[in-house]
Amino acid sequence: MLTVKQIEAAKPKEKPYRLLDGNGLYLYVPVSGKKVWQLRYKIDGKEKILTVGKYPLMTLQEARDKAWTARKDISVGIDPVKAKKASSNNNSFSAIYKEWYDHKKQVWSVGYATELAKMFDDDILPIIGGLEIQDIEPMQLLEVIRRFEDRGAMERANKARRRCGEVFRYAIVTGRAKYNPAPDLADAMKGYRKKNFPFLPADQIPAFNKALATFSGSIVSLIATKVLRYTALRTKELRSMQWKNVDFENRIITIDASVMKGRKIHVVPMSDQVIELLTTLSSITKPVSEFVFAGRNDKKKPICENAVLLVIKQIGYEGLESGHGFRHEFSTIMNEHEWPADAIEVQLAHANGGSVRGIYNHAQYLDKRREMMQWWADWLDEKVR
């Protein structure tokens, strides 16, 4: 039988190994050095292994006691692995997330709740959903965050960390976890700084236009980039656009309230340039997708969140320009040319407290904004070197 001294002296080797205690119980020592108590047993003629607990969280005596209980269950036909799985289903990250989500979605808009559920279903639950929440370690959660960062989705990485943290806090207050690893990951993240999006000064816009004219990649991504510049929309708002949101007759794009940062409808007047671009695109994506900017591989989804950044990168402006930079340039130049500040703010869908700039009446300043957005599109087109 094992002694505490033998257990403490056990060091990781090039290959995993076991230290036998007796009656099927042993200490498993993997290459990582994280020791685990396991019990080998037979039931219904099949050999199985039960993970009893982690050392040193579970002492030698506690492991023996738990193994004894498991063997007692086996003697009356109860499979401890199946019993543990049934018990842990309610303590898995996925199960607790669903409880938390059902509780929180009551105060969210339908659009936001749908967006968040998609983020968890696509990128988080497939990795850690099946794990018991109390067993999830910081490195496992960091793996989730790294997947967002690796594709350049820094804002979404930060959102994923925060929302996972809320799930862990919910587990803690409901007695199913003792530790929230999410806050500790902040220093390990590449970071998302909202105020540091690159943008171009006005005198560099002609050179950018010339570079953009050389782009030979996806026509959908190219038109998305141009429309983003002409409209000063947020990338998220642009990607959400469906053909039902585009009214060619009245020359407006309507962005659903569920997508907007302020959760209120946003109406965007279309310049001649935008109408021409979307008319061209309608023959490409409208027959196959409800999305204006349909994804390349999955027409049921919009283009990826980094599509515009990839265009910018391909024409040599990585780190110098960005989708958010287009909005900054629009705001700066329109203010310099003394267009009405409130019309500019409404076009940008900026909410500033209780002031007039925070009022999202979809008809507000529409006539003035029609004139303003046509001027802006013409100004951009004239800047050719």
From Swiss-Prot:
CDD domains, A to Z: INT_P4_C (cd00801)
GO process annotations (BP): DNA integration; DNA recombination; establishment of integrated proviral latency; symbiont entry into host cell; viral genome integration into host DNA
Domain of life: Viruses
Record key words, sorted: DNA integration, DNA recombination, DNA-binding, Hydrolase, Transferase, Viral genome integration, Virus entry into host cell
Domain Tyr recombinase: 195-373
GO MF term list: DNA binding; hydrolase activity; transferase activity
Similarity comment: family membership: Belongs to the 'phage' integrase family.
Name the UniProt record assigns to this protein: Integrase
Originating gene: int
